[in-house]
Amino acid sequence: MSSNQYTAGAVILAAGKGTRMYSDKPKVLQPLLGEPMLRFVYRALDPLFSKAVWTVIGHGADMVRKAFCHEDREFVLQEKQLGTGHALQCAWDKVTASGIDYVLVINGDTPLVRPDSIVRLLDRTAGSGADVGFITLTLEDPAAFGRVVRRHGHVAAVIEAKDYDTAQHGPEPREINAGIYLLKVAAVSPLLPLLTNANASGEYYITDIVELAVRQGLRVEGVECGNDPDLLGVNTPAELMRSEELLRENIVTRHLHNGVHVHAAGSVRIGPDVVIEPGAVIHGPCELYGNTFVGAQAVIDSHCWVKDSRLHPGSTLRNFSHAEQAEIATGAVAGPYARLRPGAVLEQDARMGNFVEMKKAVLRKGAKASHLTYLGDADIGSEANIGAGTITCNYDGVNKHRTVIGEKAFIGSNTALVAPVSIGKQALVGAGSVITKDVEDGELAIARGRQKNLRKTRHS
């Protein structure tokens, strides 16, 4: 970020293990509405700081890198997790080499932080020429958050909860440190080597920079933000659940205000990247994640799960259906109890009924597979009809093979199509057949044992 007065970048502290999460996954990768927590921090910072963002990683570093391997992110490794102050020291060479005037330092476990909160900190600190600024909150229960100590209204220090001593520091305040700082690079550089680990945790605290700055006569700003819950960190499963619920409610409310009809809104989960056009209808409970698009007048019934899929205007996904990397065109209907796996496509007015599974398969315009069917690696022509119990046998144990069915073809119930195989236009396959050879246009194919009726005897 740059203005007429200063330039700024950001350091995200994301090296912690998150012991209180009781998970093998790094804390910053804990999911919120299908996305890792850290992605929400990036979402808030990217518009403000462009590419001048460094992420300090440590515990599970390879997992974090892998989670963001398709994004242009710059990581700094903290080999030993010796505290937040040490994490900042690890990134400081990058900060100074960039030539920026101010650096924002923020924990990677603040997924609900909003750009406007960051802008407020920038304005109050860099905008006024202060050397150190940080966001504070006032809570009824300060819990385990660092306490802000003031002298005559001015910030004097930030003391971690476990180190707070009323005999030494005075009555315990309700003002806490939100863990979001703005530091003037030139002013803070001499302070970093002065950090010590003489505390209950034996770690180097970034909070000590505040007290050091006060002692050096630097200007320190505590930017008060009331009791804004969006600025609280996430350390436990309960706090993760709280943050996810706040995020879920905000996203659903935004879609309601944009003209989306959401029924049983309290049971609907919508990811941050999901796009829903006005007039679409969503029935809860259901879950929509990833880069999903739902067009105007599309309907998603209750108990559906959708990820990275496109539901075009006027399409329908009926109850208890599952769609991932799939596409449903205008007028097409899938479900109830349908499973659309990656590569499943329903073209205009196609029908996919109950207990039908599709993967890398296309139902062309007006084609129908109404029930109890598996279609894999298949192209089903327009207005073709797939009878109940039909299976495309696409896997030979080594390779996958395709099945092609022509327009207006009719596949009888309980048919096995052994790929690679092609069924011609307007061809008819008798029920119960096992088809291993191509069927030409207009032909009738029957491949089943001949029925034989025997007279029933006394002992039969």
UniProtKB/Swiss-Prot annotation:
Keywords recorded for this protein, A-Z: Acyltransferase, Cell shape, Cell wall biogenesis/degradation, Cytoplasm, Magnesium, Metal-binding, Multifunctional enzyme, Nucleotidyltransferase, Peptidoglycan synthesis, Repeat, Transferase
A molecular function GO annotation: magnesium ion binding
Nucleotide-binding recorded as keyword: no
Binding annotation for UDP-N-acetyl-alpha-D-glucosamine: 13-16, 27, 78, 83-84, 146, 160, 177, 235, 341, 359, 374, 385
Renumbered residue ranges of the record's region N-acetyltransferase: 259-460
Residue positions binding acetyl-CoA: 388, 394-395, 413, 431, 448
Alphabetical list of PROSITE patterns matching this protein: HEXAPEP_TRANSFERASES
Residues the record lists as binding Mg(2+): 109, 235
One GO cellular component term noted in the UniProt record for this chain: membrane
SUPFAM superfamilies documented for this protein: Nucleotide-diphospho-sugar transferases (SSF53448), Trimeric LpxA-like enzymes (SSF51161)
Keyword Transmembrane: no
Pfam families referenced in this protein's UniProt entry, alphabetically: Hexapep, NTP_transf_3
Gene3D superfamilies (UniProt xref): Hexapeptide repeat proteins, Spore Coat Polysaccharide Biosynthesis Protein SpsA, Chain A
Compartments it resides in: Cytoplasm
Broad EC category: transferase
Family: In the N-terminal section; belongs to the N-acetylglucosamine-1-phosphate uridyltransferase family. In the C-terminal section; belongs to the transferase hexapeptide repeat family.
Listed name of the protein: Bifunctional protein GlmU
Native source species: Oleidesulfovibrio alaskensis (strain ATCC BAA-1058 / DSM 17464 / G20) (Desulfovibrio alaskensis)
